[in-house]
A protein has these predicted regions:
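Serine-hydrolase catalytic machinery in alpha/beta-hydrolase-like enzymes
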Residues: 1-76, 87, 91
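Primarily recognizes the serine-hydrolase "nucleophile elbow" in alpha/beta-hydrolase
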Residues: 62-117
Length: 117
């Protein structure tokens, strides 16, 4: 069994990495290293999310950088998020060209279908 070295969490479309559910998970997992990241559109002050490929690339970038900062492979990192953040994590793992290999996936309020469908 792989040991878990840390967790990376991503927010939903309408919130930031300081959303109460992400903060609660962060606090509950202490002292395990936990990183919470905002997506690029949020950091740029845009009201609407980027397209999925941009969001998925952001997930991969943050997870790989976090694993590197801990000196472990991504296979020792658990990733997840709330709503859209969780969906993008699941899509990063399922990517057929460049799948993100992780220890586990946490989904909170996972959207089973795209908005308004």
């Amino acid at each position: 069994m792989t040991s878990i070295a840390g967790v990376v969490l991503f927010p939903g479309a309408g919130s930031s990495s300081s959303h109460s559910s992400l903060v609660a998970m962060h606090d509950a997992l202490s002292p395990l290293p936990v990183a919470r990241h905002d997506f690029p559109y949020r950091l740029a002050g845009k009201p609407f999310p980027d397209k999925a490929p941009v969001l998925i690339a952001s997930v991969k970038e943050h997870v790989r950088a976090f694993a590197e900062s801990l000196g472990v492979p991504t296979s020792q990192i658990v990733i997840g998020g709330r709503s859209m953040g969780g969906r993008m994590c699941s899509m990063a793992i399922a990517d057929e060209v460049d799948p993100l290999v992780v220890a586990g996936l946490v989904l909170v309020s996972y959207p089973l279908h795209p908005p308004k469908k």
